[in-house]
Amino acid sequence: MARDAAKLEATVAKLKKHWAESAPRDMRAAFSADPGRFGRYSLCLDDLLFDWSKCRVNDETMALLKELAVAADVEGRRAAMFAGEHINNTEDRAVLHVALRDTSSKEVLVDGHNVLPDVKHVLDRMAAFADGIRSGALKGATGRKITDIVNIGIGGSDLGPVMATLALAPYHDGPRAHFVSNIDGAHIADTLSPLDPASTLIIVASKTFTTIETMTNAQTARKWVADTLGEAAVGAHFAAVSTALDKVAAFGIPEDRVFGFWDWVGGRYSVWSAIGLPVMIAVGPDNFRKFLAGAHAMDVHFRDAPLEKNLPVMLGLIGYWHRAICGYGSRAIIPYDQRLSRLPAYLQQLDMESNGKSVTLDGKPVSGPTGPVVWGEPGTNGQHAFFQLLHQGTDTIPLEFIVAAKGHEPTLDHQHEMLMANCLAQSEALMKGRTLDEARAQLQAKNLPASQVERIAPHRVFSGNRPSLTLIHDMLDPYALGRLIALYEHRVFVEAQIFGINAFDQWGVELGKELATELLPVVSGKEGASGRDASTQGLVAHLHARRKA
């Protein structure tokens, strides 16, 4: 069926009315009255558990949210994506990152062309190159083995590889991986200064080979290699992830060290492609294929499972409920796993660049809020930084906890138990809170004077009723990581379809790029700032003055 705008509008109205009527409901009472609440509001896919029972929903909520998904034609849009239709309507492109991890022998067609053989060809080339670097068969110009790789990219060419490489640290048995993204010269200077060009491979990740930040850093790295080892050494110390073969050749990188990808792969969905080359070199091709396999398992589940049993769909519906119906403008991602320290930043781009839109697919203003602000830090660090606001602040911010049942350090299992206890304690505390009477009783048990009890007790009250959801898997391994990332990718898709927006373009990134190009000669003093707004003129003048001071 097609998207039913009238039914969608009516269902949203029902949801808003339902929220207004059910919002005062106490979550403690909901759990006390319903022993089966956890069972009804949780789902499993193998060892992966998704629990949303601490969110402020009931059976009516879930029935209306399913009705919403049907009215928005989530299933039809999902089928169109998997079929290779051009669902990115503003760029007239297919959206097929799912094909990058599809190892089946069936066809995946884009404009009548089966793309799976192309995907396999690039993956096999990546694996051969990674094996060569890891084994030492592919050496540097002086004959030394490569000990360090530096990935130069930005946005999707950086955030995914950084996140995955850190997450899979226990599986590293290849060269050390480093990442440079920022145009700030301090980033590349600090990265290169402890390294030896003779044992360093630099990967330049830019589809067009024109990204300003990436190419500026790449030229700095090229000079670093050439100044030490000579111009002839450049080819042996660089590889590229790009489709601009002419520009790559002009840079000095041989064609057999260039790995391409396709316009149906968006940057923030590209870690599964050749953009993941630094991950593959760090953990090996076999582990990288397990990473892809985990994502493919989630793809199959998302494609085939009915709406009410579908993890990405339910995660997306809860996300929509929190943002558009409850009015929560922010979403905190809290992985209780230090190796997932860059996951919040990765999901920040995935979600905010996808769903930070204000017009619908047909170019009309949206009728309500779209994507939330996404942010977070690992637990338990966040508890000692911003959880105060989450527990007692005036804004309600839903939390998404992620934790593994087992860690990678068996001799430190007691610390992992402490980690798990903290994760569960936070979700329980946010839901239950503490009443004024409970705060008084706690203080009275310390034999404090009555006047002190009355003075302090209000400060120790927690409202509770603060929603959180929890994702638990067995262990953070390549398969689990791939599955987790694909879960969030498809969640973004579901929310976008209900919002009625295009999740696969990012025109908001472009204006700043254009103005930065215009302002560079102004900042460097080659042109005047006349014609700019008074603030920009004042800022330029101050920068010029301070640079001369």
Swiss-Prot record:
GO molecular function, one term: monosaccharide binding
InterPro entries linked: G6P_Isomerase, G6P_Isomerase_C, Phosphoglucose_isomerase_CS, SIS_dom_sf, SIS_PGI_1, SIS_PGI_2
Gene Ontology annotations of biological process type: gluconeogenesis; glucose 6-phosphate metabolic process; glycolytic process
EC number of this enzyme: 5.3.1.9
Localization (cell): Cytoplasm
Stored Pfam families: PGI (PF00342)
Reaction(s) catalysed by this chain's protein: alpha-D-glucose 6-phosphate = beta-D-fructose 6-phosphate
Family indicated by similarity: Belongs to the GPI family.
Its job: Catalyzes the reversible isomerization of glucose-6-phosphate to fructose-6-phosphate.
Protein name as it appears in the record: Glucose-6-phosphate isomerase
Organism: Brucella ovis (strain ATCC 25840 / 63/290 / NCTC 10512)
